[in-house]
């Protein structure tokens, strides 16, 4: 994940001809590609989380606090959060990129859950890092401040409640056990 900025572009006066148009009406939001593609930004989130995790480990080594039991517990919890995010991303990518094995609705449901699981794991990891490092993690030029700020911003993807309820709506009527729900 790289530092980013938000801005605006003015396309007033730019002519768009028929040869400039890609695809057809409705292509952009066609499922499962639209929602299913969300695994890609979840992968970026996981990358930001990995960077933050590495910065935490470096901080603990540099300060000699890595053996403190409270710091070790937070580092262990951070490792769990990071691995959780990576596992969800990997499975969401498989579901979305090999769609023939699953229905469109199943793909959308799974990727929606994955993006929310990664968001939760990212928020948890940031809290653990901030608690471990303390005030330094909020002050520039500490790299933890920048990575945390970027990750916190990018984790906020649109429609999280809709993503969750859409997934739940697919899950409810499924006539299989939890073990077979995503197979």
Go through the PLM ranges and name each one.
Residues 1-83:
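Glycine-rich beta->alpha junctions and the first turn(s) of the following alpha-helix
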Residues 30, 57, 72, 90-93, ...:
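Generic detector of well-ordered alpha-helical segments enriched in charged/polar residues
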Residues 42, 68, 75-78, 107, ...:
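Hydrophobic packing residues in well-ordered alpha-helices of helical domains and bundles
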Residues 46-54, 76, 86, 90, ...:
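Predominant activation on well-ordered alpha-helical scaffold segments within soluble catalytic domains
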Residues 47, 76-83, 112, 116-123, ...:
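Generic structural signal for well-ordered, non-transmembrane alpha-helical segments
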Residues 57, 61, 83-117, 127-138:
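C-terminal helix-coil-helix/basic helical segment that borders enzyme active sites and/or dimer interfaces
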Residues 135-183:
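Glycine-rich phosphate/cofactor-binding loops in nucleotide/flavin-utilizing enzymes
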């Amino acid at each position: 994940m790289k530092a980013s900025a938000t801005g605006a572009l003015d396309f007033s006066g730019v002519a768009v001809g028929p040869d400039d148009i890609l695809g057809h009406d409705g292509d952009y939001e066609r499922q499962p590609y639209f929602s299913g593609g969300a695994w890609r930004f979840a992968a970026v989130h996981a990358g930001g989380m990995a960077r933050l995790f590495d910065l935490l480990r470096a901080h603990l080594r540099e300060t000699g606090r890595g053996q403190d039991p409270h710091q070790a517990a937070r580092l262990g919890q951070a490792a769990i959060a990071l691995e959780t995010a990576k596992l969800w991303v990997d499975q969401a990518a498989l579901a979305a990129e090999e769609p023939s094995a699953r229905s469109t609705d199943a793909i959308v449901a799974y990727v929606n859950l994955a993006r929310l699981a990664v968001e939760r794991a990212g928020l948890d990891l940031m809290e653990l890092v901030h608690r471990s490092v303390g005030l330094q993690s909020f002050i520039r030029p500490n790299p933890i401040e920048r990575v945390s700020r970027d990750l916190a911003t990018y984790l906020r993807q649109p429609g999280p409640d809709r993503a969750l309820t859409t997934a739940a709506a697919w899950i409810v009527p499924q006539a299989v056990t939890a073990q077979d729900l995503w197979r």
